[in-house]
């Protein structure tokens, strides 16, 4: 009879120890979370801010024959050294605010943009609508800081005597934004 009680105690103890061990193993396995590819991994610095013009200080243009005479905004982007992923891919957008931007400047098709990756031109076009425009895509993002400059300017070659005063009194407000995805799977 004593042996039965001792065996019962040993069996119950083994069951309890196994239950605790299995529970601990399951908890430990599910508690390990490897965060990778989230926004914490990417460092995006809008050097001059995201806005090109603002409600209190809307951008006013002068006629120019190239982008260097226009307004600009700079973005510095890279992958943080502390991340477990090795690369990412970004897309840069130009978003026009219709509540402030003159329709004349858009319909005249004289407002242009130029995108530089460092000193290399990578995108250009005409801002002719108030929608979000994809101005640079498939941007490789690594731990090396990438400097991207966006210029907006009025192309003086496209302005006529008939619309010059109206265009020069026009206002533009927009901002740049970037969408980044992890390159690691």
Task: Outline where the language-model segments fall.
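Generic "edge-of-domain/loop-turn" microfeature
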Residues: 32, 42-44, 49-51, 68, ...
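Surface-exposed interaction patch
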Residues: 18-19, 28, 66-122
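Signature of Gram-negative chaperone-usher
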Residues: 1-12, 21-27, 51, 101-157
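Short, polar/proline-rich extracytoplasmic segments that appear immediately after membrane translocation
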Residues: 2-67, 170-172, 181-185
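C-terminal, structured domain-capping segment
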Residues: 71-88, 93, 135-185
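Polar low-complexity intrinsically disordered regions enriched in Ser/Thr and small residues
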Residues: 40, 52, 56, 73, ...
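Solvent-exposed, conformationally flexible loop/turn segments
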Residues: 39, 58-72, 130-132, 136-145
């Amino acid at each position: 009879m004593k042996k039965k009680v001792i065996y019962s105690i040993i069996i119950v103890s083994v069951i309890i120890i196994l239950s605790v061990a299995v529970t601990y193993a399951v908890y430990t396995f599910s508690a390990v979370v490897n965060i990778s590819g989230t926004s914490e991994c990417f460092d995006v610095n809008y050097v001059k801010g995201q806005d090109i013009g603002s409600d209190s200080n809307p951008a006013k243009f002068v006629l120019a024959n190239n982008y260097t005479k226009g307004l600009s905004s700079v973005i510095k982007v890279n992958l943080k050294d502390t991340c477990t992923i090795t690369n990412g891919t970004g897309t840069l957008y130009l978003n026009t605010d219709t509540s402030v931007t003159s329709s004349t400047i858009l319909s005249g098709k004289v407002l242009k943009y130029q995108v530089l990756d460092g000193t290399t031109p990578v995108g250009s076009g005409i801002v002719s609508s108030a929608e979000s425009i994809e101005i640079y895509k498939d941007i490789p993002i690594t731990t090396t800081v990438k400097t991207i400059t966006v210029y907006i300017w009025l192309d003086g070659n496209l302005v006529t005597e008939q619309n010059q005063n109206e265009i020069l009194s026009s206002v533009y407000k927009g901002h740049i934004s970037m969408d980044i995805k992890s390159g690691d799977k």
